[in-house]
């Protein structure tokens, strides 16, 4: 082979070797690229998978959080509902008949005008209300009078009673004509003070002295339950009885056999039985005549009547039956017109006008929070010394809730109205009395 051919062969082999090397390098590079792509693809796939898993985890967490929140809200709603039911149940348990009565009383008093409130403090005869000479029926005149002066109560006497049918109709009509609940009262003690029994020829239960002499408290209960039953059947809801006076002065004719006894404890026991008997029949009892009329010689109907007994003596005797009647639940206490200087720092003032006696002793010492009513204000023990309006104002300021039979109803009413308007008597004081009155009037409306 010539030298030229050898060189050509050498260059060909070198070119081939270079090509082989180039192809090899290219193959290596290609393999590296392919491998890198594969790795990148796997990495990308991993990243995508991780993101997807993260997203799914986030969605799942959000869903679980939402479910938890919904559950919490539902639980809260249930607890709130249960709490409301529990509160309502507690409220229902705590809302007592006493609460219902208080609410009715508050609403009744709040709904009255001042004129109506003042009229509601008076307890008068039908003649005083209407101006007629003798009232034996309740018609248009009674209706108009009650619309003008819606008095708190009307008291009837023998002259007003002709027959059972007439009495029932008169009282039923009167009650229906009154805008507000009204007291319909009478003096029915038994014995010589029995307006209804005497007028209608009913069997008289007899004087309380006879019952007291037996020492039988059940007899006092039965007699007064009998009285209460027939009074209620005609439409009466107040009896100005029992007499709680202790007859310590045998010369005291105005009380006499109207009292159960001269022994304080006997009177106290009998009074408790009498109160229970009357009020079991639905008729309010009225203890009388505070602070005690049993020791006086005078008659407050015709003039001044006075007792010289000391506070200590009265506390041990006269007050005992009143305490007993109050503890038994008497709806009313009547304050008499006797003067008791030992109770009023020597002042000779009718008890019915004395703040020391009504507020200081009856209210505060004896703890009485029921209705305090004066004895009839047309008695000489009052009228000889005071005008009707002055006496009514004094009684209310002293602590009385109701004024019984003022000498001049119109004068007394106008006087009290003016006293409230000018601040001599506060409206709060009037409201306090009306609330005590309406607690009794509305009590039976609470089941």
Residue ranges and their predicted role:
Residues 90-95, 105, 128-133, 153-162, ...:
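Second-shell loop/turn segments in exported
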Residues 113, 133-134, 138, 163-176, ...:
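Second-shell residues forming the walls of enzyme active-site clefts
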Residues 2-184, 188-195:
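N-terminal hydrophobic targeting/anchoring segments and the immediately downstream early-domain regions
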Residues 206-275, 279:
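A substrate-binding/cap region within the structured catalytic cores of diverse enzymes
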Residues 182-224:
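Substrate-binding cleft of extracellular glycoside hydrolase catalytic domains
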Residues 123, 155, 239-240, 286, ...:
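Conserved beta-strand positions in the central sheet of alpha/beta enzyme cores
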Residues 181-188, 240, 428, 433:
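Short beta-strand elements of ligand-binding domains
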């Amino acid at each position: 082979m010539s030298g030229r051919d050898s060189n050509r062969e050498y260059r060909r082999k070198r070119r081939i070797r270079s090509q082989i090397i180039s192809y090899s390098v290219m193959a290596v590079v290609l393999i590296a690229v392919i491998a890198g792509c594969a790795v990148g693809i796997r990495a990308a796939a991993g990243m995508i998978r991780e993101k997807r898993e993260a997203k799914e985890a986030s969605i799942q967490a959000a869903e679980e959080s939402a479910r938890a929140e919904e559950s919490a809200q539902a639980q809260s709603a249930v607890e709130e509902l249960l709490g409301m039911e529990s509160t309502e149940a507690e409220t229902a348990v705590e809302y007592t008949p006493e609460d219902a009565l208080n609410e009715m009383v508050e609403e009744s008093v709040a709904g009255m005008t001042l004129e109506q409130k003042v009229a509601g403090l008076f307890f008068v005869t039908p003649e005083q209300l209407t101006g007629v000479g003798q009232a034996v029926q309740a018609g248009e005149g009674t209706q108009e009078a009650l619309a003008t002066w819606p008095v708190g109560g009307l008291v009837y006497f023998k002259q007003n009673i002709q027959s059972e049918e007439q009495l029932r109709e008169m009282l039923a009509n009167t009650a229906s004509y009154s805008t507000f609940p009204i007291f319909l009262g009478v003096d029915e003690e038994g014995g010589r003070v029995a307006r209804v029994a005497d007028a209608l020829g009913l069997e008289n239960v007899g004087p309380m002295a006879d019952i007291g002499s037996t020492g039988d408290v059940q007899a006092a209960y039965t007699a007064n339950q009998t009285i209460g039953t027939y009074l209620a059947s005609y439409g009466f809801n107040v009896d100005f009885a029992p007499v709680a006076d202790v007859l310590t002065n045998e010369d005291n004719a105005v009380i006499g056999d109207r009292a159960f006894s001269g022994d304080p404890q006997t009177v106290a026991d009998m009074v408790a039985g009498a109160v229970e008997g009357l009020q079991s029949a639905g008729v309010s009892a009225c203890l009388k005549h505070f602070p005690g009329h049993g020791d006086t010689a005078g008659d407050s109907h015709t003039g001044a009547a006075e007792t010289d007994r000391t506070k200590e003596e009265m506390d041990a005797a006269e007050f005992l039956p009143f305490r007993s009647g109050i503890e038994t639940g008497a709806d009313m206490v009547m304050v008499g017109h006797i003067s008791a200087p030992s109770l009023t720092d020597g002042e000779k003032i009718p008890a019915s006008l004395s703040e020391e006696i009504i507020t200081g002793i009856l209210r505060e010492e004896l703890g009485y929070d029921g209705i305090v009513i004066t004895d009839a204000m047309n008695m000489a023990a009052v009228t000889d010394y005071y005008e009707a309006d002055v006496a009514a104002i004094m009684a209310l300021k002293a602590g009385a809730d109701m004024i019984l039979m003022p000498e001049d109803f119109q004068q007394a009413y106008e006087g009290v109205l003016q006293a409230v308007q000018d601040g001599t008597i506060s409206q709060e004081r009037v409201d306090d009395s009306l609330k005590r009155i309406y607690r009794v009037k509305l009590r039976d409306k609470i089941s």
